[in-house]
C-alpha cells in the first residue's frame, strides 16, 4: 500500500490558518515527524493539511479575515481558501478530495478523531465503520441488477424456441428442396412431350405462326398475371405487418408515463439544494472552528488561544489553563468549569455531525435530481424518435395501400387479357388440328416453371431465416454470459455489507495481535472484535441489528486469564486500541487509494518506545505518515525519519 516512489515530495503552504501566520513545509514520502512542545501549532498544521485534502476541520486564524492552504503534490496544486465576512467564515478552492468524510474518520488520526474516541467512549463501533457505506446506493444497485436480470431472462425466454425453430426451418428446407427436384423432373417431362408433339405437327400448319404468337402472348400474360397476384399478396402481407407495427408503436408511445419530473421545478430544487449545501459548508466550517478552538483550550495548546485573545505570550495563560479545573470562557470572559465546556463542545460536535449528515443527504438528493433530469430528457428523446418512426410508417402504409390499388387494377386487366388470348388460342387450335394438345402442354409448362421459381424463392427465404437464426443463437449465448455476470454482480452487491464487516473484524484482530506483540503489554493476552446480531427496538418493533463487540482478555499475576472491559484499561492501552481500530477502518475502506496522507497526533499518553513501534508499524500503509510528537517522544524514533521542528524560535519555512 505504501508506494513512496509513486509520488514526489509534497509541499504545504499555510497562511492565517489556526494559530499559524505563515509557513511552508516540505513532506517527503515516508515518515515526517513534527517535533515541538504543546501550543506550537503542530496541530494547526495537521488541520491545515486536512483542509487541503477537503476536510472541514480547518479554521481561520482568529485575527484574520482571509487565510489559505496550498498543497503541491505530484505536479498538481490543491487549494483551500477561507474568508470571514460579517462573522461568517466561508470556504472555497479545489481541495484534494471532494468528500473527505472517510479520510477524516480513518486517516486523520488527531486526538478528536471519531474512530479513536469511539473506542475510548465505548460508542457503537459498527456504526463508525459502516455509516460511511452508502447502503442506499447498494440497494439501488441491487434493484438495477435485478431489473437487468429480469430483462435478460425475458429475452432468453423469447429465444427458448430457437432449437425448435431451427428444426422446423430445416424440415421446411428439406421439403422445398424435394419439391424443387420434383418440379424440375415434371418440367423435363413436359418439355419432352412438347418436343414430341412438335414433331407430329410439323406439316400442314397454315396458322402455326399466328398460333405461336398467341401462345407466346398467352404465356407472357399468364406469367404477368401470376406475378401481379404474387406482388399483390406480398403488398397485403406487408400492409398487415406495417399495421401491426404501427399498433405496437402506438401502444409503446401510449405506454410512456407522463413526465415524472417537472423540469422547471427540478431545476429550481437543484439550485436550492446547491445553495443549501453552500450554506451548510459555511455552518460546518464555523462549528468546526468553535469545536477546534475549545478543544485547543481544553488541551492546553495556548499558542492559538493567546493569538486569538491577544495575549502577551508570557505563558501565564497557558499555565492557568492547564493547571486549573476551570478556564476562561472565550465568549464572555468568565471562569467556567471545564466539564461544562466539554459538554458544550460535545453538543456542538453533535450539531456539526448532524449538519454533515444533512449535507451528505442533500448531495445524494442532488445526484438523484440530476439523474431524474437526465432520465426525463432521455424519455422525451425516445418519444420524439417513436413519433418520427410512426410518421414514417404511416407514409409507408399510404404508399403501399396505393400500390395495392394499382396492382388490383392491373390484375383485372391481365385477367381479361388472359381470357381473350385463351379464346383466340382455342379458335386457332381448331384450325391447326393437333395443336390443341400443344397449347395445353405449353400452359402446363408455364405453370410448372412459375411454381419452380416460386419454390426457389421460398427456399432462399428459408436459407435467410436460418442465417438469422444463427445470429440469434449467438445472441442467446451472449445473453447467457450476461446473465451469469449479472448474477455474480448481484451476489457481490448483496454480500458487500457483510463482507465489509467481516473484513473489518479480520483486519482489526490481525492488526491488534501484531501491535500487542510489538508493544509488549504483558498483562493483556488478547484484544479482539466480534460481529454479533442483537435484537434492538426501533420505534414500536424489535429488529435484528449487527453490532461489533470488543473483547479484552487480561492475565493476572498468577497466570489466570479473564475478560475485562475497555474502561479498565490504562489511558495508553485505550489509545492504542483506538488507533488500531481506526487503522482497521483505513484498510477496509481502502483509504490509501483516496488520499496518500495519514496524520497522527495526541499520543502523549503512550510511552516513547511504544510510540516509535506504532509509527514503524503504521508507516507501511500510507505514502506520507505525518506525526506530531513531543521532543522526548520523537527521540525514540528511527533517526532516518525526517524531522520538522516547531517552536517560537523557528523560521517560517521548513
From Swiss-Prot:
<feature type="coiled-coil region">
    <location>
        <begin position="341"/>
        <end position="503"/>
    </location>
</feature>
<keyword id="KW-0175">Coiled coil</keyword>
<dbReference type="InterPro" id="IPR027417">
    <property type="entry name" value="P-loop_NTPase"/>
</dbReference>
<dbReference type="Pfam" id="PF13476">
    <property type="entry name" value="AAA_23"/>
</dbReference>
<dbReference type="GO" id="GO:0016887">
    <property type="term" value="F:ATP hydrolysis activity"/>
</dbReference>
<protein>
    <recommendedName>
        <fullName>Smc-like protein Sph3</fullName>
    </recommendedName>
</protein>
<dbReference type="InterPro" id="IPR038729">
    <property type="entry name" value="Rad50/SbcC_AAA"/>
</dbReference>
<keyword id="KW-0133">Cell shape</keyword>
<comment type="function">
    <text>Involved in cell-shape determination. Required for the formation of rods and wild-type-like motility.</text>
</comment>
<comment type="similarity">
    <text>Belongs to the Sph1/Sph2 family.</text>
</comment>
<feature type="coiled-coil region">
    <location>
        <begin position="135"/>
        <end position="290"/>
    </location>
</feature>
<dbReference type="GO" id="GO:0006302">
    <property type="term" value="P:double-strand break repair"/>
</dbReference>
Amino acid at each position: 500500500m505504501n508506494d513512496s516512489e509513486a509520488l514526489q515530495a509534497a509541499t504545504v503552504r499555510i497562511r492565517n490558518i489556526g494559530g499559524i501566520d505563515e509557513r511552508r513545509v516540505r513532506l517527503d514520502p515516508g515518515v515526517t515527524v513534527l517535533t515541538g512542545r504543546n501550543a506550537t501549532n503542530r496541530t494547526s498544521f495537521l488541520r491545515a493539511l486536512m483542509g487541503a485534502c477537503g476536510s472541514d476541520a480547518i479554521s481561520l486564524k482568529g485575527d484574520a479575515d482571509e487565510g489559505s492552504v496550498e498543497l503541491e503534490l505530484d505536479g498538481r496544486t490543491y487549494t483551500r481558501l477561507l474568508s470571514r465576512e460579517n462573522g461568517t467564515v466561508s470556504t472555497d478552492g479545489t481541495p484534494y478530495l471532494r468528500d473527505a468524510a472517510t479520510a477524516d474518520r480513518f486517516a486523520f488520526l488527531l486526538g478528536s478523531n471519531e474512530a479513536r474516541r469511539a473506542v475510548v467512549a465505548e460508542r457503537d463501533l459498527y456504526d463508525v465503520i459502516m455509516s460511511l457505506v452508502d447502503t442506499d446506493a447498494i440497494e439501488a444497485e441491487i434493484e438495477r441488477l435485478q431489473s437487468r436480470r429480469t430483462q435478460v431472462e425475458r429475452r432468453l425466454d423469447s429465444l427458448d424456441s430457437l432449437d425448435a425453430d431451427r428444426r422446423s426451418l430445416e424440415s421446411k428446407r428439406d421439403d422445398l428442396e424435394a419439391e424443387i427436384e420434383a418440379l424440375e423432373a415434371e418440367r423435363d417431362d413436359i418439355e419432352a412431350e412438347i418436343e414430341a408433339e412438335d414433331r407430329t405437327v410439323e406439316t400442314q400448319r397454315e396458322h402455326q405462326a399466328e398460333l405461336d404468337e398467341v401462345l407466346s402472348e398467352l404465356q407472357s400474360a399468364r406469367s404477368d398475371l401470376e406475378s401481379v397476384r404474387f406482388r399483390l399478396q406480398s403488398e397485403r402481407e406487408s400492409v398487415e405487418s406495417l399495421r401491426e407495427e404501427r399498433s405496437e408503436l402506438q401502444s409503446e408511445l401510449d405506454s410512456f408515463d407522463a413526465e415524472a419530473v417537472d423540469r422547471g421545478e427540478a431545476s429550481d430544487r437543484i439550485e436550492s439544494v446547491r445553495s443549501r449545501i453552500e450554506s451548510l459548508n459555511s455552518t460546518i466550517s464555523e462549528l468546526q472552528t468553535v469545536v477546534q478552538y475549545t478543544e485547543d483550550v481544553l488541551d492546553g495548546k495556548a499558542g492559538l488561544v493567546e493569538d486569538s485573545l491577544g495575549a502577551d505570550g508570557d505563558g501565564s495563560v497557558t499555565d492557568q489553563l492547564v493547571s486549573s479545573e476551570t478556564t476562561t470562557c472565550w465568549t464572555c470572559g468568565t471562569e467556567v468549569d471545564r466539564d461544562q465546556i466539554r459538554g458544550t463542545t460535545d453538543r456542538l460536535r453533535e450539531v456539526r455531525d448532524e449538519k454533515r449528515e444533512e449535507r451528505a443527504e442533500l448531495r445524494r438528493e442532488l445526484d438523484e435530481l440530476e439523474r431524474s433530469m437526465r432520465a426525463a430528457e432521455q424519455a422525451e428523446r425516445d418519444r420524439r424518435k417513436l413519433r418520427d418512426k410512426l410518421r414514417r410508417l404511416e407514409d409507408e402504409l399510404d404508399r403501399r395501400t396505393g400500390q395495392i390499388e394499382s396492382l388490383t387494377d392491373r390484375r383485372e386487366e391481365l385477367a381479361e387479357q388472359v381470357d381473350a388470348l385463351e379464346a383466340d388460342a382455342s379458335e386457332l387450335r381448331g384450325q391447326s388440328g393437333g395443336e390443341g394438345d400443344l397449347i395445353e402442354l405449353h400452359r402446363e409448362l408455364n405453370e410448372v416453371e412459375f411454381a419452380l421459381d416460386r419454390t426457389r424463392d421460398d427456399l432462399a427465404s428459408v436459407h435467410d431465416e436460418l442465417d438469422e437464426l444463427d445470429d440469434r443463437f449467438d445472441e442467446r449465448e451472449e445473453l447467457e454470459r450476461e446473465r451469469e455476470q449479472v448474477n455474480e454482480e448481484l451476489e457481490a452487491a448483496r454480500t458487500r455489507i457483510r463482507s465489509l464487516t467481516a473484513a473489518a473484524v479480520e483486519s482489526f484482530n490481525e492488526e491488534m495481535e501484531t501491535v500487542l506483540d510489538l508493544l509488549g503489554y504483558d498483562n493483556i493476552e488478547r484484544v479482539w472484535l466480534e460481529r454479533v446480531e442483537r435484537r434492538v427496538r426501533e420505534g414500536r418493533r424489535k429488529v435484528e441489528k449487527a453490532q461489533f463487540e470488543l473483547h479484552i482478555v487480561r492475565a493476572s499475576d498468577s497466570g489466570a486469564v479473564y475478560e475485562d472491559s475497555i474502561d479498565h484499561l490504562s489511558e495508553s492501552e485505550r489509545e492504542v486500541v483506538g488507533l488500531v481500530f481506526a487503522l482497521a477502518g483505513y484498510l477496509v475502506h481502502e483509504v490509501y487509494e483516496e488520499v496518500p496522507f495519514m496524520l497522527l497526533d495526541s499520543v502523549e499518553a503512550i510511552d516513547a518506545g511504544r510510540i516509535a513501534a506504532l509509527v514503524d508499524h503504521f508507516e507501511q500503509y500510507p505514502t506520507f505518515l505525518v506525526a506530531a510528537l513531543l521532543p522526548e517522544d520523537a527521540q525514540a524514533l528511527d533517526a532516518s525519519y525526517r524531522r520538522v521542528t516547531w517552536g517560537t524560535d523557528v523560521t517560517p519555512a521548513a
